Amino acid sequence: ALSSAASDVYKRQVVDILRRADIKTDMISITGDINVKSAQGVIVQADELLDEYVFEGDELLFLPGGPGHKSYYDCKDLLELLKEYNKKNNRIAAICAAPSILGNLGLLEGKKAMAFPGFEMQLTGAVIITAPERVVTDGNITTSRGMGTSLDLGLELVRLIKGEELAEQLRTSTQYI
């Protein structure tokens, strides 16, 4: 899901690695506009708008973080979708400040989770994991800390969806050793 002022690296790096793994990946705008401006002022063209997208067979809902994470609260459809995904045990991923959305929705209760330093207290009900860990998966939810861990998050999602072997191949081919 793309919101205004989400950090550019999170969405681009995670989407890039998922697409390299041939995982169908759609960037969905929650702003009502197909063109979404990142926190760094980069315009990203979404694939579709949330109110037009049909969620059928999607394996993952990913929330990039950054200063725009608060705008997720303004999108009631997204919040309901997150609750529905969690109820069905569908995979949800979030990075930086975005895991706080999951915490505030009660989706992290009893689960290990992490967020950008300073946002841990908003991971309501979570077992908070900190450095040196870079990404943590507990059940259907995967969280990560920030820009420097976005490739780790992408590779973890590839591992979960397509397996360890492909994740390692991508790690090597991207020189992330």
Where are each of the predicted segments found?
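Membrane-interfacial amphipathic helices and adjacent loop/beta segments
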Residues: 33-40
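Short, acidic, Ser/Thr-enriched surface-loop or helix-capping motifs
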Residues: 3, 38, 136
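Active-site-adjacent pocket-lining segments in enzyme domains
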Residues: 7, 17-30, 47-177
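Short glycine/proline-centered loop/turn elements that form peptide/ligand docking sites
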Residues: 12, 29-32
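Single conserved hydrophobic/aromatic residue that forms the stacking wall/gate
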Residues: 1-6, 10
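Short, contiguous strand/loop micro-motifs
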Residues: 1, 37, 68-69
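Short gly/ser/thr-rich secondary-structure transition/capping motifs
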Residues: 40-48
